[in-house]
Design a protein with these regions (language model features):
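C-terminal membrane-cytosol helix-exit motif in multi-pass small-molecule transporters
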Residues: 1-19, 225-230
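Helix-to-loop junctions at the C-terminal end of transmembrane segments
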Residues: 92-108, 196-197
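Loop-to-transmembrane helix entry/capping segments in MFS-fold secondary transporters
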Residues: 74-78, 166-176, 205-208
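Intrinsic disorder in cytosolic terminal tails and internal cytosolic loops
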Residues: 14-28, 105, 229-241
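Juxtamembrane intracellular "pre-TM" segments in multi-pass secondary transporters
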Residues: 12-45, 69
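A membrane-interface helix-boundary motif in multi-pass transporters
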Residues: 73-76, 110-113, 196-219
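Extracytoplasmic gate region of multi-pass secondary transporters
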Residues: 38-96, 148-157, 184-193
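C-terminal transmembrane helical hairpin of 12-TM major facilitator-type secondary transporters
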Residues: 108-156
Length: 241
């Protein structure tokens, strides 16, 4: 796909859609310094990483959860969860993008208010998914949670692009992805695995419910970072135009 895009799509002039003329390319160190000078970039970086810690942890362990708690085979769990995650994940991202496109021009704080709302509203649904005994109700709760969990990506990535200058947008996204993968993908599944081992002696096979609950609710901690970033995001976005 990368080769196809490279050979068929013309590279647009950087900054041609910005209000100000494109600035000359800055050194990576200078570009990073300029990014972190905007406090909302720092907060969205770690808010998004904590949000991802929750999502990655649940995604990795959800199949084991379905096997242990609901007695499904790994094949059945893969079909059910895989299809639901694909369909409703796409819906969540599209819906998140649609909402933030309409709200952020009125107030840039919606770039961070929206993922905050998604995290807070999604929290009770992940608890319902983990603790409901009826499979149909548990899966319905998962669908609602997953639409909200996937949807946070749209406002977060949109904000990162809005904060970065035309010559440093790739660096801004790369730094975000590095942080998200370092914290979210490295720590999220490991945290659930560690808690599984610790809680299994007390709760048996049901211990996975509690370990996934801890990881699932870390996205609420991300709200603290999002709301802190919302205090300066309007000024930071305006200074990037």
């Amino acid at each position: 796909l990368a080769l196809l895009v490279r050979s068929t799509v013309r590279e647009p002039l950087r900054g041609c859609m910005d209000a100000a003329p494109p600035a000359p390319m800055a050194a990576s160190r200078e570009a990073l310094r300029a990014l972190f000078a905007k406090r909302s970039y720092f907060y969205v970086l770690f808010g998004g990483a904590l949000h991802a810690l929750s999502v990655y942890g649940l995604v990795i362990w959800i199949y084991v959860f379905m096997e242990r708690v609901h007695g499904m085979s790994m094949k059945e769990a893969s079909v059910y969860i895989g299809l639901l995650s694909l369909l409703f994940g796409l819906l969540g991202v599209a819906l998140g993008g649609w909402i933030v496109d309409r709200l952020s021009p009125k107030d840039a704080r919606w770039f961070l208010w929206l993922p905050s709302l998604q995290a807070v509203i999604g929290a009770p649904f992940i608890l319902l998914f983990l603790y409901l005994e009826r499979l149909d109700l548990a899966l319905a709760s998962y669908v609602i949670y997953w639409v909200l969990a996937a949807g946070y990506n749209a406002p977060v990535y949109a904000l990162i692009q809005s904060l970065a200058g035309a010559s440093s947008r790739a660096l801004a996204v790369a730094t975000y992805l590095f942080t998200v993968n370092l914290i979210g993908l490295a720590i999220g599944p490991l945290l659930i695995g560690f808690l599984n081992d610790e809680l299994r002696s007390v709760f048996g096979e049901q211990g996975i419910r509690y370990s996934m609950m801890v990881a699932g609710l870390t996205n609420v901690v991300a709200v603290i970072f999002y709301m802190a970033g919302a205090r300066t995001v309007r000024r930071d976005v305006a200074s990037s135009c």
